Regions:
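C-terminal helical subdomain
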Residues: 183, 199-236
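Active-site helix of classical SDR
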Residues: 123, 159
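Substrate-binding pocket helix/loop in short-chain dehydrogenase/reductase
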Residues: 99-100, 104-112
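The beta1-alpha1 cofactor-binding region of Rossmann-like NAD(H)/NADP(H)-dependent oxidoreductases
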Residues: 45, 63-73, 105
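Active-site loop immediately N-terminal to the catalytic Tyr-X3-Lys motif
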Residues: 101, 150-155
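Canonical Rossmann dinucleotide-binding motif of NAD(H)/NADP(H)-dependent dehydrogenases/reductases
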Residues: 6-38
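Residue(s) in the substrate-gating loop at a strand-loop-helix junction
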Residues: 143
Length: 297
């Protein structure tokens, strides 16, 4: 069957969370290169503004995904400056590693707040806008750790299982509409989030630009499952039919069970500290007001 013509992206508005760096920034650049209008959202407004300088026509907006009021203000500000949002990329997320039994409650809660509640806020706020206009595309960034539980990152892995599951369920609810839902599942990406990870025999890492390219591809040719790289998706499908013992033996043979569990804590220290202390700099109400009226003091 011939592949359908790509959907035009030029002039479309895309809102990207956690877009000041990493996958988010690479996606912002890739979308802008297709003529899309980009709203860069990030908790660190200064970094977002610096990022926007490298993305033609982009606007930088403060965003705390854990705060529904802040998220709504972000979408309102994006639409006020660029027009109705056609695409939301729920990219913001953190990964803090270590043995599950040693993980403190604050670390677990922080990951759930950002990786789960942040995605839920975005979905619940943008989908009514899409439904009112009769179209839209929701892209949620999960992980291959959301398809296969990875030791050393149990809470992170659990949050990404949630992202995949809620995305799949909501897609089912929207099948009779023109609203698209996609779930992107990369292997470890060469960003600060992957600092210190073990690179075992057969392990695969990708670049932020690889993920961004797949996101643009899925906007042009909508589909739900978006593994990055695509080959890993086929591998997971094949190994998924094997008995659990066989799957685990293969994982140990390729040291997949050490990718997160064997991470170098010293190499990860700077990232882990930033992730642990990435608290919003403004009270939610004040932040929302500033986002709405464009003020910054």
């Amino acid at each position: 069957m011939a592949r359908s013509e790509p959907r035009p992206l030029s002039g479309k508005v895309v809102a990207i969370t956690g877009a000041a760096r990493g996958i988010g920034l690479a996606t912002a650049r890739a979308c802008a290169a297709r003529g899309m209008k980009v709203a860069i959202g990030d908790l660190d407004l200064g970094e977002a503004q610096r990022a926007a300088e490298s993305v033609p026509g982009a606007v930088a907006l403060a965003l705390d995904v854990t705060d529904r009021q802040s998220f709504e203000a972000y979408l309102d500000a994006a639409e006020a400056q660029l027009g109705p949002v056609d695409v939301l990329v729920n990219n913001a997320g953190i990964m803090q590693l270590g043995p599950f039994v040693d993980e403190d409650e604050a670390t677990a809660i922080r990951q759930v707040d950002i990786n789960v509640h942040g995605v839920l806020h975005g979905m619940k706020l943008v989908l009514p806008r899409f439904k009112a206009r009769g179209a839209g595309h929701l892209v949620n960034i999960a992980s291959m750790a959301g398809k296969t539980g990875i030791p050393g990152g149990a809470t992170y892995s659990g949050t990404k299982f949630f992202v995949y599951g809620v995305s799949e369920a909501v897609r089912g609810e929207l099948l009779d509409t023109a609203i698209e839902v996609s779930c992107v599942m990369p292997v470890p990406v060469n960003t600060e989030l992957a600092a210190g990870l073990q690179r075992g025999r057969g392990s695969t890492f990708v670049e932020p630009e690889d993920v961004a390219a797949e996101i643009v591809s899925v906007l042009e040719h909508p589909r739900f499952d978006v593994p990055v790289p695509r080959s890993i998706g086929r591998l997971v499908q094949v190994t998924g039919v094997l008995p659990r013992g066989a799957r685990e033996a293969i994982g140990r043979a390729f040291k997949a069970d050490k990718v997160l569990a064997g991470a170098d804590s010293n190499a990860r220290r700077a990232y882990e500290l930033r992730a642990a202390h990435s608290e919003p700099g403004l009270e939610p109400g004040k932040q929302a007001k500033q986002l709405s009226d464009g003020s910054s003091d």
